[in-house]
């Protein structure tokens, strides 16, 4: 069993504070996106698999440290669970690699907006494979998500036209990586849902197995597909890039921990709304820290993406309060 340790000591007022847990969750999410973007934006960076391996290694070591302190409990690695969970690892590696590649080529606001499309794929995947349903309000949020993505693309194209040379292609390969990422992310979530029932994993079990099983896969792919020459390693593994990778790996654990913390001290309803509202500061961080397009269409797409997240969160809450099955939309 994996679980969070509840602090009953002198700092219990902090451990049981809703606003602090929400703030910690939002800060961790922003930090992870910003540090990942910083690394992949470094001049000549081309070792995404190594970056992901370092992050996974940091996650595993931090989990062991938290278990030593008594703040996390998770199952030890065993052959049966590893065999059952390994198919998930393949989807995970595909998901995080395509995520890093899309973030490398797309601005943070556009990346954040397009990630919403994964929600649509997951929702209809649940309709197809688990007998779920899509309500009218959820469908409305999906339409807003698609609209925000279209507007974001137009804003990006508008910005490219101003900076690109005459006759240069305006196609951004980041959109291809984003499309693959949405598909692989949805597949990862849907397959993991089935496997969790098989293994009965909890949050920290899932994080531990995801990271420790992905490490050899990431390292093998790096050796096969990336340049391990001394010159390239020196260029990619600078002090700044490695520091950012370590911070990113630590924030991944923080996000998982803060998610459970937020649900414990507030409610699942509050947490789902925070997740929707959190899209805005993540998108804005791209405008503040990086050279993201700053035209009307780009700003408007952020607003639409933010609105779609709120509508979706409210729709999910209403669905939980009124669990009668509605007719599946196919």
Curated annotation (Swiss-Prot):
Localization terms from the record: Golgi apparatus membrane; Cytoplasmic vesicle membrane; Endoplasmic reticulum membrane
Residues exposed to the Cytoplasmic side: 1-13, 70-81, 125-138, 192-203, 263-269, 316-330
One GO process term, biological-process aspect: transmembrane transport
Keyword annotations: Cytoplasmic vesicle, Endoplasmic reticulum, Golgi apparatus, Membrane, Sugar transport, Transmembrane, Transmembrane helix, Transport
Assembly with partners or alone: Homooligomer.
Function: Involved in the import of GDP-mannose from the cytoplasm into the Golgi lumen.
Name assigned to this protein: GDP-mannose transporter
Originating species: Kluyveromyces lactis (strain ATCC 8585 / CBS 2359 / DSM 70799 / NBRC 1267 / NRRL Y-1140 / WM37) (Yeast)
